[in-house]
Amino acid sequence: MGEPVDPGHVVNEKDFEECEQFFSQPLREQVVAGVRALDGLGLADSLCHKTERLCLLMDLVGTECFARVCRLDTGAK
C-alpha cells in the first residue's frame, strides 16, 4: 500500500495538549513565541523572509480571532 508511518510523525494526545496550551495564551505571548522560534533560524532579511514572518503573524492573529468567535458562539448556546 504505502510506506510505513514513522512513530515520530504520529499525532498523539500530547500534541493536542501542547496546541491547546499554546493557543490558550494571550495573542501577545503567541506572537513573541513565534518570533523567538523564527529568530534562531538565522534568516536573511530578504523581502521573501519578511513576507513569511508577516504571514506567520497573520496566521496567529486569524487563529486567535477564530478561537474567540468560536468561544462566543458556543457560549451563546
Swiss-Prot record:
Name of protein: Protein ORF30
InterPro entries, A to Z: Herpes_Orf30 (IPR008002)
One Pfam short name: DUF717
UniProt keyword terms in alphabetical order: Late protein
Superkingdom per UniProt: Viruses
